[in-house]
Amino acid sequence: MSDQQLDQPSLSHEERQHEENKLIAQRKEKLAAVREQGIAFPNDFRRDSLCGELQKQYEGKSKEELEAAAIPVKIAGRIMLNRGAFMVLQDTSGRLQVYVDRKGLPAETLEAIKTWDLGDIIAAEGTLARSGKGDLYVNMTSVRLLTKSLRPLPDKHHGLTDTEQRYRQRYVDLIVNEETRHTFRVRSQVIAHIRRFLNERGFLEVETPMLQTIPGGAAAKPFETHHNALDMQMFLRIAPELYLKRLVVGGFEKVFEINRNFRNEGVSTRHNPEFTMLEFYQAYADYRDNMDLTEELFRELALAVLGTTDVPYGDKVFHFGEPFVRLSVYDSILKYNPDITEADLNDVDKARAIAKKAGAKVLGHEGLGKLQVMIFEELVESKLEQPHFITEYPFEVSPLARRNDQNPAVTDRFELFIGGREIANAYSELNDAEDQAERFHAQVAEKDAGDDEAMHFDADFVRALEYGMPPTAGEGIGIDRLVMLLTNSPSIRDVILFPHMRPQA
């Protein structure tokens, strides 16, 4: 049985599993033979070149030029194709062919090559050459096995197309799917660019606790754990906000953190319990400054990753090069729902009825501001396709944000929506310690009334504010959702290397 025999679309799942088990047994026999000959997994080879880089570096060299230059190279990679005389190797940079010179290679090497399988990792030395078809290859003068692969790669007919298996076996997904490798290279580029962008503007990168005694900084349900040595309940953080603002109090006037947050909530194409968030804070700035900074960041990211400010996503194109729309929560409800009037939004009973009809989970004790946000979430969010800054969130749902000077019923806050998804949340920070204490008390009352996502009272944070925090603007940006946009990925699981899954039966 060979990999080619397994590569038959007519096989049923049971037949395919049976044949795969036979292949694994054969490969284990081959590994046993290699063990008898000496070191089965050598680690003394050092390459001097990468496959993809060689392709780029010598793209313009002709067959005759390469033959005259006789450029020696050492490469290593995984066998992805085996055509007998030629094998295709893949490393982190790309693919390159190697030529099995039956006249130039020792007889024992040629015999060993016959036992190699797709997925095996080999080391090759030789000179660069170009085929009659124009393909670059390495004319091998020596080659040896570095790692024996015991499991066959997915065949070319079926591949690794089952979405759940791609998430569960990301290592295989990365081997066989260039699109997946590209997605995570882009993710790395995005994070590196954000760091550079903020560093250039004087921000200091910091790290704050993942384990917290009081989960704060967001309206979310936390994961709970127990610290054995201290014999106390602790929580995985839902946000780093309150610690970052403590640092602003301490004199670090521009700080940021890129790290994980944890929220014990639902799993969907937009939500993962463990996710990556950028949060940054700058003193002597307000939420409007953050809107300007965010537009600049998103334009630079699109240009750096895509080479354009037009971002394709599904059947849409988002325009990062144009000014982002700025609209209040209140005005956005009226704009996108012409059947709702200002009188409806300003009446608690009418607003409650609209929220219930829209499908919101109304408990009955909500104030007018919270009801307006519920209506917005149900009837507006999904309609915000192009980038929208939604501003002036009611203070009831913004316990950490500064009230607006002209209208104290709302806060100096915005959320950024693109493609109907929240990408960022920001506000001018509340730095009035007494107001903050009152809002924490109101949140505790909400929690006592049954709101699992309401905040705890954080006395130490109030104490920090009592020392005085300068006027400050802060923002959180979801890295995963941002990468989804920039890689045209439909699910958040597509941009997280190892997303959470239920255990297999």
Curated annotation (Swiss-Prot):
Pfam families: tRNA-synt_2, tRNA_anti-codon
Places the protein is found: Cytoplasm
Swiss-Prot/TrEMBL cofactor(s): Mg(2+)
UniProt: Mg(2+) 1 binding residues: 415, 422
Basic and acidic residues bias spans: 12-23
Superkingdom: Bacteria
Biased composition range(s): Polar residues: 1-11
Record's cofactor remark: Binds 3 Mg(2+) ions per subunit.
Protein family (similarity comment): Belongs to the class-II aminoacyl-tRNA synthetase family.
Subunit note: Homodimer.
Protein name: Lysine--tRNA ligase
Organism this protein belongs to: Ectopseudomonas mendocina (strain ymp) (Pseudomonas mendocina)
Biological classification of the source: Bacteria, Pseudomonadati, Pseudomonadota, Gammaproteobacteria, Pseudomonadales
